Swiss-Prot record:
It comes from the Bacteria. The keyword Hydrolase applies. Belongs to the peptidase C69 family. The active site is at residue 20. It comes from Salmonella dublin. Coiled coil: none annotated. It is an enzyme of class 3 (hydrolase). Its EC number is 3.4.13.19. The lineage of its organism: Bacteria, Pseudomonadati, Pseudomonadota, Gammaproteobacteria, Enterobacterales. Keywords: Dipeptidase, Hydrolase, Protease. NCBIfam families: C69_fam_dipept. This is Probable dipeptidase. It catalyses: an L-aminoacyl-L-amino acid + H2O = 2 an L-alpha-amino acid. One of its GO terms (biological process) is proteolysis. InterPro entries: C69_dipept_A-like (IPR047804), Peptidase_C69 (IPR005322).
Amino acid sequence: MKKYLAFAVTLLGMGKVIACTTLFVGNQASADGSFIIARNEDGSANNAKHKVIHPVAFHQQGEYKAHRNNFSWPLPETAMRYTAIHDFDTNDNAMGEAGFNSAGVGMSATETIYNGRAALAADPYVTKTGITEDAIESVILPVAQSARQGAKLLGDIIEQKGAGEGFGVAFIDSKEIWYLETGSGHQWLAVRLPADSYFVSANQGRLRHYDPNDNANYMASPTLVSFAKKQGLYDPARGEFDFHQAYSQDNKNDTTYNYPRVWTLQHQFNPHLDTVVSPGETFPVFLTPITKISVAAVKNALRNHYQGTSHDPYASHNPQEPWRPISVFRTQESHILQVRPKLPQAIGNVEYIAYGMPSLSVYLPYYQGMRHYQPGDDKGPIGRATTLPTGHSARCKRWLCRTTMRLRQMCNTPAKHLNSKQLSSSIRWSRAI
């Protein structure tokens, strides 16, 4: 791919909306029998991430207090060892994003979604004291003994404290994958991923079917359907209850910002699928891939930017391209959590982490059995992507990966597109490592 220097210019001009792309793969749909959950965490290119191992904690008292609002939750007396990828400015106590605990449970939190106006008018987000992405991993992962239990605990918290925003959260263990979506301030639905299927989400509520009599595959807030009826969000005379229609947003912006990402990945794994990017299109929730999906294929999916098509904004140098790519410059990190049930947990559970834009970064494996990470994993202060780090900051993994991205841009950019300032900056960055 050519002219990588245009990546930063193009994507920084596309706004700072927090957004992500999510992909799950069931064990019968994967190439090696693995369970896989993966997500690009898109926010700010300037946000350094800390990869941290939290040790087991005993005799805890008091409450966990969120970093970015007033949410609180009682601390468990005993908290399991767990891993996390924190924002640099949270004292490694919030915005954990993804990790595994010592019970072998993993999670990815969150996929930002937007619930419908009518649903939120009836049951608004509890923005000041409700649970948000900031706190979810820190509260759930230290105590969840299974993927199902993790989803249920998050649902219980939403019912009791409320959701402070719309989100989707994935849970994984050696037996199954669960995915929970908010419906409103206190309504939620969680679904078990069919073993032979994969699932894609791109900043929009995707779940639809709910069977309250099928406890093996569905969990939900107890008033999910009755509340929708009462508030006029669902009319039984029109057919089966549809969670997406009742509780999720679907507007013009979704057609260009979200639909193309779902369409692209579904057509990557099911090329003959009869869907188009068009207002009102209904994409299948779960699909069985034509060819089983490997971790390498998941990496390629998270690196997708419509390459080879007219919608590739980087090749066309078009910051006004309406289709939002999967791989963007403001990706803070991209993670893939893989569970290989036939192997010992210490090596069977792996986190692959790419710092920065996945198209320009490298996925580094972190095995659950690792007793400690390298010193650079938990370093990285505030700073702009164009600021030269100094001292210990220059050794942090995030800066090293950003430097690699910069050098790859240089190597793939014709000299005529570079000026002396850009060249000097890149040379200084290369010397910093």
